[in-house]
């Protein structure tokens, strides 16, 4: 994408500091982790599926006095809670984790009357955060570390701005921030989704795509180096896509959430996401792959410069889903931020 794509996004006046990388010992991912178990959770107007990753404590087993905090992971457009499997497993040395399937995605039911919107996703995440914070044990009643990717990054940013009492820190992995002056070819394809009837046509076209084709396209678009993706992860993704294809609302969830995302870009004034970013009070980590094909990496320093208490980590050779493609560097950046917080 050209710089014209970004010309109306805020320009940094000063660079954000580089995110430190933690030297904490992490479990070795000798094998691919299976998806963490989960359950349906009631939220406003329905239910969402939430997976839970138990806290493991330090690798050396010395749990006396070891920090034990809580985290919520929010996936991106077309993703699911399983996108966070490996990262949640690594961060379990410090964080007990919950990962949500946004309404209509993964194993979650669609929202009431099929009304997908950014605000609806924000409400669902707030409800899950309230649930996580209310769970008994260490961390009861405390703010939760919130991590989001792409659409989930934008949703997480808005949650942190609206409900700072719920969010301890914010980690944004290639968040889908508003961009303007889009190149004409890109603009026409997306803006058509705003027209009545077009999302339904897109849904019909998507219904003819096989799970294997969908996964191959996703890997090409989302990963900096598709060859890095283990065959087992491809097979797992295809199985998930087959499961999704049996849900009558699956294609609608994707197209209508994309429409809601584009609509949210049109908000001005205090409701604009860039204004919200400037109002954040939480320590914030911005992570971006320099081969991101979906959200231009040039946005990374701009976002980090706008957020008051931010740090930035750019990952060389990585695409749009750093938590999937580079879980260990991502985990070390998250832990590096947490270890720098006062009293940690």
Q: PLM ranges: what are they?
A:
Residues 46-110, 324:
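Conserved HGGG/HGGXW glycine-rich cap/lid loop of the alpha/beta-hydrolase fold
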Residues 120-142:
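Conserved acidic catalytic loop of the alpha/beta-hydrolase fold
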Residues 153-164, 170:
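Short glycine-enriched nucleophile-adjacent loop
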Residues 169-204:
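Flexible "cap/lid" loop of the alpha/beta hydrolase fold
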Residues 206-276:
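Conserved alpha/beta-hydrolase catalytic His-Asp/Glu region
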Residues 267, 291-295:
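Acidic catalytic loop of the alpha/beta-hydrolase fold
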Residues 280, 286-288:
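Short beta-strand/loop motif that positions the catalytic acidic residue
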Residues 308-344:
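Catalytic active-site module of serine/aspartate enzymes centered on a nucleophile-bearing elbow/loop
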């Amino acid at each position: 994408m050209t710089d014209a794509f970004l010309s109306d996004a805020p320009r940094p006046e000063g660079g954000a500091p580089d995110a430190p990388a933690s030297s904490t010992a992490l479990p070795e991912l000798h094998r691919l982790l299976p998806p963490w178990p989960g359950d349906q959770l009631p939220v406003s107007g329905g239910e969402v599926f939430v997976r839970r990753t138990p806290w493991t404590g330090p690798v050396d087993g010395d749990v006396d006095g070891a920090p034990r905090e809580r985290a919520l992971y929010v996936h991106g457009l077309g993703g699911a809670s399983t996108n966070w499997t490996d990262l949640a497993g690594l961060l379990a040395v410090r964080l007990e984790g919950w990962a949500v399937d946004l309404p209509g995605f993964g194993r979650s039911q669609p929202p009431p009357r099929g009304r997908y919107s950014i605000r609806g996703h924000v409400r669902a995440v707030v409800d899950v955060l309230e649930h996580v914070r209310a769970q008994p044990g260490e961390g009861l009643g405390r703010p939760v570390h919130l991590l989001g990717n792409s659409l989930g990054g934008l949703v997480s940013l808005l949650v942190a701005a609206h409900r700072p009492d719920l969010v301890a820190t914010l980690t944004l992995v290639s968040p889908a921030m508003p961009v303007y002056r889009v190149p004409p070819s890109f603009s026409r394809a997306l803006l058509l989704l705003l027209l009545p009837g077009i999302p339904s046509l897109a849904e019909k076209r998507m219904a003819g795509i096989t799970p294997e084709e969908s996964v191959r396209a996703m890997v090409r678009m989302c990963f900096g180096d598709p060859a890095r993706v283990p065959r087992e992860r491809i097979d797992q993704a295809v199985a998930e896509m087959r499961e999704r294809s049996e849900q009558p609302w699956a294609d609608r969830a994707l197209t209508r959430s994309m429409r809601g995302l584009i609509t949210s870009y049109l908000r001005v004034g205090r409701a604009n996401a860039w204004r919200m970013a400037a109002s954040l009070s939480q320590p914030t980590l911005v992570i971006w792959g320099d081969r991101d094909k979906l959200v231009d990496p040039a946005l990374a320093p701009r976002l980090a410069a706008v957020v008051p208490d931010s740090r930035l980590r750019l990952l060389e050779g990585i695409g749009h889903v750093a938590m999937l493609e580079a879980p260990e560097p991502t985990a070390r950046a998250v832990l590096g931020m947490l270890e720098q917080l006062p009293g940690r």
